[in-house]
Design a protein with these regions (language model features):
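Extracellular carbohydrate-recognition regions
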Residues: 4-46
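Extracellular glycan-recognition surfaces and repeat-rich motifs
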Residues: 40-67
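Secretory/extracellular carbohydrate-interaction modules
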Residues: 72-128
Length: 210
């Protein structure tokens, strides 16, 4: 068994943060680390070592394509999560998401990501598409995500937005969706963050299906 530092930048004074998570010593598969012809700007960073077979900037011009390979219980377990740091006193961003090729159990969206996180995403369940908001907190060492709201949609293109407010230690994140990129609807509860320098992250995972 190996130990990997994955919470080294979570400086939280309110409680002790576990510095190590266990992971299996899984050999790297052929091609995982090979250059795939795509070049990201230096402002981007991966949450884990990426699998270069599963992302691309060249397969579809003007788009970042993310694929899944393993079933994950939470976003924290996913390898190809890519992000930028937030900045204060306020910041926000939105993404346009093409969900036409998503499969049963897939979840793709936009997260305010740190030790405690939340995200707005499209989820495929029972053949239907839903916009969902999901929170995660590991208080009392209970590690699980819980859904706070869902809205069924039929569209294959949606816009997802996260706004962050750090003024006067407010530290809140707000989640929105749009079907046309102009008219926005707030979804889910406001997320109370516990860390200033979290990430705005693009996520794509496959959850266990019933």
């Amino acid at each position: 068994e190996k130990k990997g530092i994955v919470t080294s930048d979570e400086f939280i004074n309110s409680h002790i943060v576990r510095s190590y998570h266990s992971f299996a010593d899984t050999p790297e598969e052929a091609g995982e680390s090979d250059y795939n012809g795509s070049n990201l700007g230096l402002e981007w960073q991966w949450n884990h070592n990426p699998d270069n077979r599963l992302w691309s900037l060249t397969e579809r011009e003007g788009y970042l394509r993310l694929r899944t390979v393993d079933v994950c219980d939470t976003v924290a377990d996913a390898r190809n999560t890519i992000s930028q740091r937030t900045f204060g006193p306020e910041c926000g961003a939105y993404i346009k998401l093409d969900v036409s090729e998503m499969k049963e159990g897939d979840v793709a969206g936009f997260a305010a990501f740190a030790e405690k996180y939340g995200y707005v995403a499209v989820k495929i369940e029972d053949g239907k598409k839903y916009i969902v908001t999901v929170w995660y907190d590991d208080n009392d060492d209970v590690e699980q995500e819980f859904e706070t709201e869902r809205v069924e949609i039929t569209e294959n293109e949606v816009y997802l937005r996260v706004d962050c407010d750090f003024k006067n230690a407010t530290d809140k994140a707000y989640f929105y969706y749009s079907l046309d990129g102009e008219n926005w609807t707030k979804i889910g509860d406001t997320l109370q963050m516990n860390y200033y320098g979290l990430h705005l992250s693009l996520i794509h995972i496959s959850e266990p299906t019933r």
